[in-house]
């Protein structure tokens, strides 16, 4: 009952959690949480599989076209794939959000047409989501703009804690039958960067960001979602040669 109240309904969600996470979420002791996780992992038979079995699991991977043949080619030929996180970083106006908006439309196509026959969740941290642009993309593709917009679930995240909380909401929506196949976070690091200013808070920021990325990966793995995130850039003054521009977030990103 406590697990259901916390929005946890399946074994995989329990199996990939840490005892402290499960304990905090469900309001149970670490010892009880540890036993629950062990039981879930045993029932799911999580462990090693041979290459043939792993290849069979890979057959369930979904691919969503980006709208650019060249970009699809760079991503392996078929676009953004499920059960993984795809990051796009660049300067303001470089097209990161545009790719995300196009993916939000394309995910609604049938699988055989380069989509995933599902809905998109768009976590907007910087006020970049534009319904008018979605309508333009849909009209160009000869799709019903209003129907396309109804299949995109948008949430404006106002701080990093809100951004983290929204991931739990996504799990609840999927449990309630929403066919979500794409999660977009635009942008990944904006709130973390603003709230943890200065070198003195760098370690705290990196820990929180690292945990958030791990939660994104758990969502992607548990529900066979594709995750697309955009990221800001900064200049590395210590770099003597080449392009000093690098993605915000350091090695954990």
Indicate where each model-derived feature is located.
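Compact, charge-rich alpha-helical regulatory domains located at protein termini
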Residues: 1-54
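The Walker A/P-loop phosphate-binding site
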Residues: 2, 39, 43-147
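Conserved, well-folded catalytic cores of nucleic-acid-processing
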Residues: 6, 17, 39-46, 74-78, ...
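Residue-level signature of catalytic and energy-coupling elements of molecular machines
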Residues: 14, 71, 88, 134, ...
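Amphipathic alpha-helical transducer elements in NTP-driven molecular machines
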Residues: 65-68, 72, 82, 97-98, ...
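Conserved inter-motif catalytic segment of the P-loop NTP-binding fold
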Residues: 115-201, 215
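Phosphate-binding/switch region of NTP-binding enzymes
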Residues: 206-253
